[in-house]
């Protein structure tokens, strides 16, 4: 049932019920268990007008559904909100239970911590043979306590808030226990506590309330009691005497005290103390306190005292409320109707005991037995902020009638004010009075257990427990020794709490914890994960220092409060290990001194995947340095087939010179100066800086530049060819030379001599290769071949078509030597420092290892036959297309056949070469050949080699 808040107090109207007055049958235990729920009636539509007793209400909206009821928000004629509860009653037995709940609410009406009763009525349906009871009560707008707790999952309830909730609930329970005869709620739980206003709570749901139940003695009564407890109580809040009926201890007010202890535990830790174990732990009262959240030791002792296994060891409601008010620091104005005796209906107190200064218990022989009580044990707390528990004073005077009326309204005394005045004692009761004299003089009007016409108080029979012999006192000491002492509670607390605060050092000691946390953060910074190092490599403008140096620099500039992940994602870790070679390609970090990022050589198996990734990820490519010309003396010692690829990383000693040289190189890339002589002279003198320490650095850097272009895509290739001129002598592989040359507008006259050198080579091999029509110039496979990295080219040279490559490209060792001698005579060098035999020496370094394979010869023969058959048929095509001068083989029209194009192109090159030889000049600075007439043969010849290689594969 969901009830809730009204700012204006509820108006109490005239109550008109069929039976007037108080009925004892309403509070007796029903003879049959609770009815089994069936399908309830349909919901009442909004706007329906219903007469409930003397109040006419209009249904506003549907709120919730209970066990056997529907709850609606209704408005009176004065538009005040109330709650209308429509209860489903299948038979007369269930009607008796509902009538008992209504009677309980009527008796408790007007209490500040109990939901107020307004009116009720009952209807009988002959057609359906059932009853419907309408109960009108107070509306609580704050909702349930459980909803409020759900809003505090991150920040749990404070101890002050818990004490306020317990104080309001215990005040409502005390009103029930103070009745004559007393009523027990039997269903105390957080679901039955409602929030009226901020920090104000009320108790509801009195359907399980009844008078105390006597111990069961026969099998029939045991079975009946078990069924009744199972129907009207909540399992996790049941006391041990409710679970084990054979103990024959009776179910009285001490069962509600147990439920208060469970309620307090759940308010603290959001769970019940016996939820994981079950009934076996309840029977033994075995539980523990979690280490978090932290509450005071006095709060834990209060919960432990309420959850005692024996009912007689639990405090009564007055002692419970007194302890709560003392923890709050608020005086308790509720009278003690028990006269200082920890008694209940069916569980009388034990013999009184006195605790000596040493901590032992000794019997009291000088005082009457009933005046001593086993209260909540007074324990020395570990915190100086918590005051010790005070026992109820035995010498205090009884409260006056005016104080009772001003502080607490008793349901019984409100009906009989004249009797209450006569029950006030005229003098305090001396401590030495006898037991009979004490019970003849009542201490409070709430202690009255009879009707208003009798002045003799009927109290539960208490046996004469005055200690007469030492033997009796010893037996009682043994019984009460089960009370938890200070040492026992401290041992339990030490076992449960993981991190207990130091004694005599304040509430908490955090200095060791802060020291440990600081050390942990320092260790985390020193042992940085791979992801953090990767971020440093990406965004730091200089090479990242060691982890220890980085941690020290971070610690000097920033606080150590940042959180560093200690566990890396598996997918991220695998990706970083698989793409280690290409990790730097995806980083556009700042360049120091003009150096471009240095990619590593990818594997041949994954070069197509890497090219696909690079085309997608590179929106803006990094700057690419032009290749560097290397002299033949440096190039002669290179063996590309054997040497692994190592990027040219600048050393620390020559860092300044390298930065300056790279800066000049980048200016050469962007510059469009027509004075090519000064640029070439500058570039010729520049490589010596990179060749001081390592002879292989020039080779690796030239390989690196070509490989970097392969991965950055077509956009970077076009950007490079429009801004720089690359010499063919700088490239070790013709395949890689093709990749770096797409459209170059300035070339040196060394290419003229190179063209002359190629005349004999092309004329001898033209008949074998000019008719290759299997692959078009713009085929997708050829484009992918253009992007083959350097590592793949080394493997191609040692592949199955190595013999064809050697014969076509170099014409054998003898032919290479003959070309070398002829070109030395005819070559006119542009620069005086340039050696003319670089290319032959570089070409002699190619070693073909698979030229003797029979499958290579067979493939070459098939290729030659196909070329011969198609040569005559394709010779006449494409004559009109020679006027086009494409800058790269990729731009050749598909209609122009390659064989015919090569043949006609060679003729044009021969004629151009003769023209240059007829007009030689000694001035090297005025010689700038036309790029359109000199550059294309190399591209076409090398693309021809690609076409040949693809056909062989």
From Swiss-Prot:
Pfam family for this entry, one: Pkinase
Keyword entries, A-Z: ATP-binding, Cytoplasm, Kinase, Nucleotide-binding, Phosphoprotein, Serine/threonine-protein kinase, Transferase
Disordered as annotated region, ranges: 343-402, 427-451, 538-606, 641-669, 748-791, 864-953
Residue ranges, compositional bias (Polar residues): 355-369, 378-402, 433-444, 558-575, 748-766
SUPFAM superfamilies: Protein kinase-like (PK-like)
Catalytic activity annotation: L-seryl-[protein] + ATP = O-phospho-L-seryl-[protein] + ADP + H(+); L-threonyl-[protein] + ATP = O-phospho-L-threonyl-[protein] + ADP + H(+)
Biased composition, class Low complexity, residue ranges: 547-557
Family annotation (InterPro entries): Kinase-like_dom_sf (IPR011009), Prot_kinase_dom (IPR000719), Ser/Thr_kinase_AS (IPR008271)
GO biological process: actin cortical patch assembly; actin filament organization; regulation of clathrin-dependent endocytosis; signaling
Modified residues (Phosphoserine): 872, 875
EC number: 2.7.11.1
Protein name, entry field: Serine/threonine-protein kinase ppk30
Annotated organism of origin: Schizosaccharomyces pombe (strain 972 / ATCC 24843)
Lineage, uppermost ranks: Eukaryota, Fungi, Dikarya, Ascomycota, Taphrinomycotina
């Amino acid at each position: 049932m969901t009830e809730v808040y009204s700012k204006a107090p509820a108006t109490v109207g005239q109550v008109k019920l069929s039976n007037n007055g108080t009925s004892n049958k309403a509070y007796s235990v029903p003879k049959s268990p609770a009815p089994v729920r069936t399908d309830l009636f349909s919901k009442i539509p909004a706007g329906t007008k219903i007469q409930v007793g003397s109040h006419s209400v209009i249904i506003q909206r549907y709120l919730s559904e209970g066990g056997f009821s529907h709850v609606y928000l209704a408005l009176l004629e004065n538009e005040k909100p109330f709650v209308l509860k429509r209860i489903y009653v299948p038979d007369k037995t269930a009607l008796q239970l509902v009538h008992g709940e209504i009677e309980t609410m009527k008796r408790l009406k007007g209490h500040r911590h109990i939901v107020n009763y307004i009116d009720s009525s009952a209807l009988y349906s002959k057609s359906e043979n059932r009853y419907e009871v309408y109960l009108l009560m107070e509306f609580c707008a704050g909702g349930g306590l459980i909803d409020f707790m759900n809003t505090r999952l991150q920040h749990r309830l404070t101890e002050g808030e818990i004490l306020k909730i317990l104080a309001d609930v215990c005040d409502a329970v005390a009103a029930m226990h103070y009745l004559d005869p007393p009523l027990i709620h039997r269903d105390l739980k957080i679901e039955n506590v409602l929030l009226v206003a901020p920090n104000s709570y009320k108790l509801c749901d009195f359907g399980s309330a009844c008078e105390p139940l006597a111990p069961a003695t026969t099998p029939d009564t045991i079975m009946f009691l078990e069924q009744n407890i199972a129907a009207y109580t909540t399992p996790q809040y049941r006391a041990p005497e409710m679970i084990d009926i054979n103990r024959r201890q009776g179910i009285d007010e001490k069962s509600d005290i147990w439920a208060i202890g469970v309620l307090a535990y759940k308010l603290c830790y959001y769970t019940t103390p016996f939820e994981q174990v079950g009934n076996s732990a309840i029977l033994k009262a075995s539980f523990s306190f979690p280490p978090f959240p932290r509450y005071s030791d006095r709060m834990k002792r209060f919960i432990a005292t309420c959850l005692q296994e024996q009912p007689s060891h639990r405090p009564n409601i007055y002692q419970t409320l007194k302890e709560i008010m003392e923890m709050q620091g608020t005086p308790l104005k509720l009278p003690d109707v028990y006269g200082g005796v920890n008694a209940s209906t069916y569980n009388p107190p034990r013999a009184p005991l006195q605790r000596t200064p040493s901590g032992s218990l000794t019997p009291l022989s000088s005082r009457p037995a009933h005046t001593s009580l086993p209260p909540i044990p007074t324990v020395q707390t570990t915190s100086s902020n918590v005051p010790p528990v005070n026992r109820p004073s035995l010498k205090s005077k009884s409260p006056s009638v005016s104080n009772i009326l001003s502080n607490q309204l008793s349901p019984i005394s409100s009906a009989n004010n004249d009797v209450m005045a006569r029950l006030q004692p005229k003098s305090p009761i001396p401590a030495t009075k006898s037991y009979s004299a004490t019970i003849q003089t009542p201490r409070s009007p709430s202690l009255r257990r009879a009707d208003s016409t009798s002045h003799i108080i009927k109290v539960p029979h208490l046996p004469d427990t005055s200690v007469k012999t030492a033997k009796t006192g010893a037996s009682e000491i043994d019984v009460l020794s089960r009370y938890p002492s200070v040492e026992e509670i401290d041992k339990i607390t030490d076992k449960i709490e993981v991190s207990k605060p130091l004694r005599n050092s304040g509430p908490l000691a955090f200095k060791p914890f802060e020291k440990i946390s600081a050390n942990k953060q320092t260790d985390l910074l020193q042992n940085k994960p791979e992801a953090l190092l990767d971020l440093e490599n990406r965004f730091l403008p200089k090479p990242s220092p060691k982890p220890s140096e980085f941690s020290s620099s971070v610690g000097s500039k920033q606080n150590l409060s940042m959180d560093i992940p200690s566990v890396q994602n598996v997918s991220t870790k695998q990706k970083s290990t698989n793409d280690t070679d290409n990790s730097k390609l995806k980083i556009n970090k700042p360049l120091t001194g003009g150096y471009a990022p240095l990619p590593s050589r990818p594997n041949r198996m994954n070069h197509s995947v890497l090219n696909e990734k690079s085309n997608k990820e590179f929106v803006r490519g990094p700057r690419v340095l032009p290749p560097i010309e290397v002299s033949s003396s440096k190039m002669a010692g290179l063996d590309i087939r054997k040497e692994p690829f190592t990027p040219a990383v600048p050393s620390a000693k020559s860092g300044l010179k390298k930065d300056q040289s790279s800066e000049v190189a980048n200016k050469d890339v962007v510059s469009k100066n027509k004075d090519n002589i000064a640029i070439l002279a500058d570039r010729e003198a520049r490589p010596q800086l990179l060749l001081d320490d390592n002879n292989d650095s020039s080779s690796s850097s030239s390989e690196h530049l070509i490989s970097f272009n392969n991965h950055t895509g077509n956009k970077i290739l076009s950007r490079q060819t429009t801004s720089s001129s690359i010499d063919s002598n700088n490239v070790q592989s013709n395949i890689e030379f093709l990749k770096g040359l797409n459209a170059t507008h300035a070339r040196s006259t060394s290419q003229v001599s190179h063209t002359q050198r190629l005349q004999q080579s092309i004329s001898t091999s033209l008949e074998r290769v000019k008719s290759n029509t299997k692959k078009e110039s713009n085929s997708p496979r050829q484009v992918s071949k253009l992007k083959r990295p350097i590592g793949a080219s080394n493997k191609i040279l040692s592949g199955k078509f190595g013999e064809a490559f050697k014969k076509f490209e170099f014409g054998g060792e003898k032919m290479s030597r003959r070309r070398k001698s002829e070109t030395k005579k005819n070559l006119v060098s542009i620069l005086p420092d340039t050696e003319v035999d670089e290319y032959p020496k570089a070409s002699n370094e190619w070693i073909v290892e698979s030229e003797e394979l029979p499958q290579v010869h067979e493939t070459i023969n098939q290729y030659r036959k196909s070329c011969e058959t198609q040569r005559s048929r394709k010779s006449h095509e494409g004559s009109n297309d020679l006027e086009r001068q494409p800058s790269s083989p990729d731009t050749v029209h598909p209609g122009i056949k390659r064989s015919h194009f090569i043949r006609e192109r060679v003729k044009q090159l021969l004629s151009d070469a003769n023209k240059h030889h007829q007009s030689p000049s000694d001035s090297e600075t005025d010689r700038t050949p036309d790029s359109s007439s000199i550059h294309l043969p190399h591209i076409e010849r090398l693309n021809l080699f690609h076409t040949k290689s693809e056909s062989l594969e």
